Structures are given as structure tokens and as C-alpha cells.
Amino acid sequence: MAEKKGSSSEKTLYCSFCGKSQHEVKKLIAGPSVFICDECIDLCNEIIRDELPSTEGARDSRGDLPTPSEIKANLDNYVIGQEIAKRTLAVAVYNHYKRLRHKDKAGKDEVELAKSNILLIGPTGSGKTLLAQTLARMLDVPFVMADATTLTEAGYVGEDVENIVQKLLQSCNYEVERAQRGIVYIDEIDKISRKSDNPSITRDVSGEGVQQALLKLIEGTMASVPPQGGRKHPNQDFLQIDTTNILFICGGAFAGLEKVIENRTEASGIGFGAAVKSKKQRSLTEVFTEIEPEDLIKFGLIPELVGRMPVVTALAELSEDALVQILTEPKNALVKQYSKLLAMEGVELEIRPAALKAIARKALARKTGARGLRSILEQSLIGTMFDLPNTSNVEKVVVDESTIEENKAPLLVYREAAKKA
């Protein structure tokens, strides 16, 4: 190490990086035929410190991968019931991200693992969208939800399939590396089924054509996306996104699919000795457990698309008890949400067990699943929530069965009455 001060006979040493002499700096550290001063060392440390957060962030985004049981436990906090669907999803998602890690480390000669996209089948309001949203939030990966009914073939009015990738990029602030490991949920996939088995002279721009366009995206392709969401024009640079590692989850109600399955599984009989079983004896949930790829093809999905979604899971119809649980148990349960809303007015909300069952029965009658719960509860409380801000002495709002069944106003408990009691 060369000190700052030296005799005049000694040769003056200079920093190999900034060129300052040993007399201009505090310390000059010697290496094999090179020197570095203390100022350059400080500058190097600053550069390293600035780069560390982004490196740590990238490491965290691929950090410890939760196990299938941990993924399912997290789904249990938000989604009631649907045990088979949650287990299937947990394993599929775990294997997908495990595959990506293997791909990063694997050599050229190792076994290449194929991607397993997921198809969720279930009636409306059974939790398909919520499952996908909860998964993405837990894994901290970019997530986008697309509606298949708005998609058309490229060149026609409407959204083309590459808009899905553009939305995914927007959701992660145009970080290409993160977007390529994201999750895409395509809802209403059953609405783009082929209109019939017979080819038509008219072009089906929102049916089979969209399925063909989705096929390449789901399988894995290089999608060209305009930077920062601009319109496409010939003289601009495009962002190239590889969709090979994006996990696609498709969902749909597939109304009428149960008839296709029943026609395949139930043998028709004729004559006095034939065993005739009523189709009404089995629930929709039981029928969907016997689903085969050929049923989806008969329904109107093209065989290539069905083949790209090897993980097929059916969600059960929600029972009355399950709907009551949905009202009260999840982290974001509706009863908790409305209790918080009224608590902001200094009022307590009590919904009696009989009222909860009445709400569940009403939702079942509407055939909208869990999606109908909010509108029923909102309808019963709308008048009370309108009057509460102008009323100062209400302590509690009580919703009983008559409030739901007979559209009566909720009971109001006033503070004076509460004190006397």
C-alpha cells in the first residue's frame, strides 16, 4: 500500500481508475501493477448498493415456492368448499413454477417438462375467478383477467388475443421478465365454442377463429406488443413476449355440457327388460366428475385447444350451507364487509342465523351462486344505510328472517333502549 506522502526521490503513483495522484487522495491501494484510490472504492460501493435492491427483488419474486398444501391452505381462507378443485389447482400451479425453476437450471440434454394449463368448469358464482385471483395474489406474480366474449380474430372489430399479453405487461409495469412468468385467466371460454359441428359458409370470427388464435398463445409463441400500450403501426419497435412460461387458466360455466356427458355415459335401453335410469337422479356436480376431452370437443371446443389444457377440474354447485359459510367465514366475507361499513357510522350489525339461511335460499333460487349474495344483502340494507347518517342514536341494526323473506325493514336498536334493558 502506498501512502499519501513520500520522498521527492520516489516515483509518484496514480490511481488506475480516476488518474489522481497519491498526493490528491487519502489512500492509494496497490494491486499487481494497478492502483485504486479511496474515492474510487467509495464510488464502486455506491454502484453495488444501488444494484442490490433490484437483484434481491428478482430473487424474491422467484423465492421460496409454497408447497401444494400451503397453496390450498391459503385458498381455504378465501374460497369455501371446492376441495377437489383447490387440491387440483394447488398441485398444477406448484408443478408449473417448479418446472420453470428446473428450466432455468437444466442443461441441454435434460428432460424438458411440458406446460400444464388449467380448465375450470363450474356453474356461475361457484368461485372460478376468485380461485385464480387468490392464486396470483399469493404467488406475487402478474395476473390479468380476460373475457373470451370480447375477443375476435385479428383484423376484425374487437380485441385480438395479443391484447391479453399487453394487459399482462401493463399489470407489471412493462417488466418483460416478470410478465413471462405471470398468470392469465380467460373467463367465459365456453362462449367461443363452435356454433355447430358442420362447417358454415359464414365466417365465425368470435368462435372457432378465436380458439385458433388462442391456441398459439396458450401453447407458447413470441407475441409482439406495442410499447406502453400504443397502437400498432409498421415503423415502431415492438416488445417481444414469450408466452411459453405463462400459465393459462380458462374458466366457463359450460351450460349444456352435462347433457353431452349424460348422452355418452348413460346407456339407452328399449323393451320391457331395459334398465332405465332417470337423468334427474344425478346432480350437476356428479355428472361433471365424469368429464372426458371428447365431451368438450362435442360441446364445441377444437381438439387442439382441449389438448393444450390437460388439467381439467370441475367446481361443485354450492349448497345452502356453503353459501351461509361464504357469507360469514372468508377473510373478505360479505357480513364482515357490511359490518365494517356500518361500524364507520358507529353502528353494530347483527344478522341472525335464520336470516343467513334465508339469504342462501334466495341465492339458490336465483341460480347465480355466490354472486347473488351481495345483491340480496344490499337490497335488505339499502333503506337502513340511507337513513343511518341522519340518525344519531342507533346502536345496532338487526337483520332477521322476515327482513329477507318479506322485505321488512331491519330492526333498529337505539342507545336509550339498550341502556334501559
Curated annotation (Swiss-Prot):
It comes from the Bacteria. Keywords: ATP-binding, Chaperone, Metal-binding, Nucleotide-binding, Zinc. GO terms for biological process: cell division; proteolysis involved in protein catabolic process. Zn(2+) binds at C15, C18, C37, C40. One of its GO terms (molecular function) is ATP-dependent protein folding chaperone. ATP binds at P123, T124, G125, S126, G127, K128, T129, L130. GO terms for cellular component: HslUV protease complex. CDD domains: RecA-like_ClpX (cd19497). Residues 3-56 form the ClpX-type ZB domain. Belongs to the ClpX chaperone family. Component of the ClpX-ClpP complex. Forms a hexameric ring that, in the presence of ATP, binds to fourteen ClpP subunits assembled into a disk-like structure with a central cavity, resembling the structure of eukaryotic proteasomes. HAMAP family: ClpX. ATP-dependent specificity component of the Clp protease. It directs the protease to specific substrates. Can perform chaperone functions in the absence of ClpP. This is ATP-dependent Clp protease ATP-binding subunit ClpX.
